């Protein structure tokens, strides 16, 4: 995700928006700003550490107050680019779930029986990073609803916003079409 986001190559205004709006969930450090200096490390949120237990469960009580407050801000839409392991560290409450839009990535290919979609796992990080970069580079008004977010994403990607279900997170499906779609 970070490589595709290319934080260091963003224009100054987009970097400032990232510093103000983007939060990074780290298995080692909790919540970080995109430009926080941290030592190189490899630690997945799916890790079960001796004496600590599963990291997602460890971080949940620490992350929830901060992320709930962000999601509860008026006119706030949270674009959730976390993988499933990281999503387990914060599950939006029913009260804030409607302002959270989780990104899923699918590859669609043509078959004789019609289009077939498969979940993209390996390249999903890159696509999420490209989406975040696109949104940071936009010079238009920041999206203030899931529908506005989907419209902004549609400027650069084939997307489908799933219908709202009260108390549930919305899903924005990014659809990569064709065999070579990445």
Show which residues each predicted segment covers.
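Active-site helix-to-loop segments that bind/position phosphate- or nucleotide-bearing substrates
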Residues: 1-7
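Internal, well-folded beta-alpha domain core
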Residues: 7-182
